[in-house]
Design a protein with these regions (language model features):
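Alpha-helical transmembrane segments and their immediate juxtamembrane cytosolic regions
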Residues: 1-385
């Protein structure tokens, strides 16, 4: 492996960040498949109602599961003040640009490996921009540059300008019948931009026999215009990280300020929802405020409990996910582990039924991935970019 790969451990880390990131990845790579398998095995209205928490909303609104991706972006931003401060103090700018470029390229390629069909080796089915890691690549690149080269006040101005710029574009630009305040799946400006810029390289797009590009009617995520607000999601984490790193405030007060700011942002986002709807698939500006507010409140809670009160009982296992988040994500999306438990446990299916057998397979895969990550954690091997 190249340098990018596995590196040994390192300076002191913010424990609450590792554990919160670990919780996020546990839900994504450890629990999601198990819960959806259970939804096919367990009958009853109460359990099916519970599954709303593990399902993305179709379009308008926000569910707990919709927070998983914004939290991932937010936490990448929290780390920026801890990892990039030396570049503000005169460290090599050449090294900074090399480091940011390397991180951007690797995250972009990892995203294509996970969701861009790069491993399919079929040029006609490669998707260019379609994955969470790529949104982090874009958001982190610009958030880090803003952090190094501008003041915190300027960064707030930039974040507001990006939010308002996205909103203004969606409201006032009309092209080919798209946009002009239209937030429907088939009529919004971000949809038109993705179709026009990505074309055949948009996720789920195919070229028909006549040579025309057809876009899947079920795929509604947008990426090009949404890159503006991806940057703000990462910047929101950077603001939280600057507060946490500051030595001018007592730790308990930092937690309180984070929580209050989170409440304000979420409240403003829901108020904005009346004019500029909260739509996660479009990454609207109101959704960024809502999700960033929730992220601030979660960060406040975890920071207070773990780093202020030093309570970690029953939580440290999450660091196995949190300190190898990219490895956990890629293992889950790039490798089909189901063949391993299926090869060993297929004899159970006639006895427990197909629905419960799917639960066994999902749980076995989750345990296998955790075991791999635990072995890496014990060996102090971490996938770095």
């Amino acid at each position: 492996m190249s340098k990018l790969t596995l590196s040994a451990q390192k300076p002191k880390r913010l424990a609450s960040l590792d554990i919160l990131r670990g919780l996020d990845l546990f839900f994504l790579v450890g629990l999601e498949s198990v819960m959806h398998a259970l939804s096919g095995a367990v009958e009853g209205e109460k359990f099916q109602a519970l599954m709303w928490n593990f399902t993305h909303v179709d379009w308008l609104g926000f569910s707990p599961w919709d927070l998983v991706m914004p939290l991932f972006l937010f936490m990448s931003g929290v780390s920026i003040p801890f990892s990039m401060s030396r570049y503000r103090k005169g460290a090599s700018r050449r090294e900074l640009f090399r480091r940011l470029f390397k991180r951007f390229v690797l995250l972009w390629l990892f995203g294509m490996l996970c969701q861009g069909n790069l491993l399919g080796l079929d040029a006609s089915r490669i998707y260019l921009y379609s994955n969470t890691l790529q949104s982090i690549a874009v958001g982190y690149l610009f958030a880090a540059l803003f952090f190094v080269f501008t003041s915190w006040k300027t960064q707030i101005f930039i974040a507001l300008a990006l939010l308002l710029g996205y909103w203004g574009s969606m409201e006032w630009i009309t092209i080919d019948g798209f946009g002009g305040g239209n937030y429907t799946p088939d009529g919004n400006l971000a949809e038109w931009i993705d179709r026009s810029v990505l074309g055949r390289f948009r996720d789920a797009a195919v070229v028909n026999a006549a040579g025309a590009v057809e876009f899947a009617p079920w795929y509604r995520y947008t990426w090009i215009l949404s890159s503006l607000t991806f940057v703000v999601s990462v910047m929101s984490g950077t603001f939280a990280g600057m507060l946490l790193k500051s030595g001018k405030m007592a730790p308990w007060r930092k937690a309180m300020v984070l929580a209050v700011l989170g409440l304000i942002m979420a409240g403003l986002g829901w108020l904005w929802n009346f004019d500029h709807p909260v739509i996660k698939k479009l990454w609207t500006s109101s959704m960024v405020l809502v999700s960033s507010g929730y992220c601030f409140m979660l960060m406040a809670l975890f920071y207070y409990v773990i780093d202020v009160c030093h309570f970690r009982f029953g939580l440290n296992w999450l660091r196995v996910y949190g300190m190898n988040s990219i490895a956990a994500y890629m293992l889950t999306l790039c490798i089909q582990f189901r063949c391993i438990p299926h090869s060993l446990l297929y004899g159970l299916e006639p006895y427990i039924g197909s629905a419960w057998y799917q639960v066994v397979l999902a749980a076995s895969c989750s345990l296998l991935i955790y075991w791999i990550l635990w072995r890496m954690y014990r060996a102090q091997l971490f996938l770095r970019v």
